[in-house]
Amino acid sequence: MEDGDYLVIAETPVSVSQGRLVDESRYSPSLKAKFLTTVWSKYLWGYVFGPILGIKKRTIKNLRRLPKETYAHKEVVLQLYGLKHALKPASEAGIDLSNAPGSCVSLLPENPQKVAKQLKAEIGKNVCVMIIDTDATYKKNGKYFTGLPIAIDGIEANKGVIGYVKGQLGENMGSTPLGCSENISVEEGLKIANIAEDYQKSLATEMSTIHSVKSVLGTDESSVTIEALDSITHTPAVILSLIHI
């Protein structure tokens, strides 16, 4: 890395390094979790709200085939993040289901801004370190916001389902910068985050959702092992360099 470079890191490896893994098999689904999974997410969002708001066809397809095994996931969201995040039909609170083994999931990292600054100090060069999440930041009426619990300054965070619904009526700005070692503008943060995310999406081993697991690893979502995850090449970080013409 050289002075002026950007180091863009996906949130999951940071979370794992902090021990922020949760085993969903240890959670007993409540009636509320079952209702939110089946009636609210699968049927109301899959067949009514989703099509009306024009959410991605891929998301609608995935909602319509939600299995009963996701009851425990919704219970985790309810207990750890509350109803406003559990009401979101998918990708609740930025919890990552696709890059963890077995019934484990990865929560968002704790204090990503502090982590970004620590990493910059360890690198020892004048670089910008950014931690991002693929969940969207939206823009409406000149304001940036996200349903995620955390984001860089300038993006209103922790909006939960309200942010998700409002976002469908606004502009999707792409991936969300969670923390940054520098005080950068929201516009710059979004630009850099999306360049890195576009590169990661171009890779054959990219698993954007839990439903990508079977095509990449050749195994069911519930059968992911550490060995299976180790069998593919991961790209948890991307280095971006400015080219001066």
State each model region's role.
Residues 25-34, 77, 132-163:
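Composition-driven recognition of glycine/serine/threonine/acidic- and proline-rich low-complexity segments
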Residues 1-3, 14, 30, 37-38, ...:
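Disulfide-rich extracellular domains of secreted proteins
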Residues 2-5, 123-134, 193-235:
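Flexible, glycine/charged-enriched surface loops at secondary-structure junctions
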Residues 243-245:
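Conserved small/polar residues in nucleotide/adenosyl-binding loops
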Residues 157, 161-222:
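A two-mode feature
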Residues 20-58:
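Active-site cofactor/substrate anionic-group-binding motifs, chiefly glycine-
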Residues 52-125:
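Internal, conserved structured core segments that host functional sites
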Residues 2-30:
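N-terminal low-complexity or amphipathic/hydrophobic leaders
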